[in-house]
């Protein structure tokens, strides 16, 4: 093949890869869920160390919400379901939401 044809094709066939959209997982404050349970959720479900878990829990308590992390949609939605299931199982009204970054 002619080198000119290959050069023309080379530039046009490079696919553009788009990174997946990111979403924030946010815990919301309520008057019933204990601080200890929130910390436990952060450590067990989100794999936060104790220091980060306590910082996020205090944000939830003092500011009304705390950003847990950024994930792709599938992971964020799964995390929310896990939080709600754990809260139901332990009879707490803890809520968690997802918002686009």
Predicted regions and their residues:
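Terminal domain-initiation and capping elements
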Residues: 1-101
């Amino acid at each position: 093949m002619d080198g000119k044809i290959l050069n023309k094709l080379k530039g046009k066939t490079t696919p553009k890869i788009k990174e997946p959209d990111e979403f924030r997982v946010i815990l919301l404050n309520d008057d019933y869920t204990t601080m200890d349970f929130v910390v436990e959720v952060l450590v067990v479900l989100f794999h936060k160390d104790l220091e980060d878990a306590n910082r996020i829990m205090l944000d939830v308590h003092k500011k009304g919400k705390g950003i847990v992390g950024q994930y792709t949609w599938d992971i964020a939605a799964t995390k929310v379901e896990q939080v709600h299931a754990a809260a139901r199982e332990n009879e707490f009204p803890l809520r968690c939401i997802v918002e686009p970054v």
